[in-house]
Every structure is written in structure tokens, then in C-alpha cells.
Amino acid sequence: MGKRFIFILMACSLLSIATAVHAQHIDKQTYTFAIKKADTLKLDKYVMIDQIQGTQSKPVILFAFGGGFKGGRRDNPDYISYFHFLARAGYVVVSTDYRTQLKDIDKSEYSDLQGFSSALQQAITCAVEDFGDATNYIIEHS
């Protein structure tokens, strides 16, 4: 009798957890925040549905994907569960593009430290500019 009761109790608990998680639907919207020459820069906004109707301000997390300024994607599937976790915790998550200036780098051109250092600094400056534009877009549209 005791084992059966515990089993039923656990099954009910799991069912209620699954229902609660399912009820917390995350909405994703994609916006273009800048066009720079051939690059169209977009951002994805993740927010829990019940937070959309509210008028109370929510904290925003601006996420920068990794990739050493050579590659990466704002919508990499590996990040989505992290975005959903943060959205369920009450944050608005914004994952943004930025120009990856080192993606087409000719390694032979930058074989010396000074040449590579210059290219890296240019890539960082470009990414910072893009994050500034994304931040301005978020502020203007909040």
C-alpha cells in the first residue's frame, strides 16, 4: 500500500510539473535592427507569454554568441534552452547578430602579430558598434 501511494503521489507531481512547464510558453520575435553594407543584422527577443500583457518593466539580458569574431549564430540551437530558462525566470532575452569580421580573414596576410592584432582590434570595434546599435534599438522599441 505504501509503495503504491508513493508511486501515485510521484506521478501526480510529475504531471503537475509538466503542465506548469507547458503553460509557460515562450514567445520569440525577430527584428532587423541595422543594415550595414551587405550585412542585415537581426535580433531575437524571447519573452514568456504571460509577461507580454503586463505593463511592468522587465529586465533585459543582451546575449552575445561566442565564436571569436569568426563565426557563430544568434539563434544557435544550443542556446535556446538557456534563453527559455531565463525568460521563465522573468527576463526578456535578446540574442543579437554582430558582424564577424574575422570570418574571411586571409591567414597569410596576418602571419605577424602586429597584423593580426590590428585585424582583431578592428573586429572588436565593429562588434561593439553593432551591440551599441542593438542596444539603441531595444531602448527605442521598449
Residue ranges and their predicted role:
Residues 68-71, 93, 137:
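Serine-hydrolase catalytic-loop signature spanning alpha/beta hydrolases and amidase-signature enzymes
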Residues 68, 100-102:
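Alpha/beta-hydrolase active-site loop signature
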Residues 75-95:
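Short amphipathic alpha-helix adjacent to the substrate-entry channel of hydrolases
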Residues 23-56:
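N-terminal cap/lid segment of alpha/beta-hydrolase-fold proteins
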Residues 109-142:
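Alpha/beta-hydrolase active-site loop
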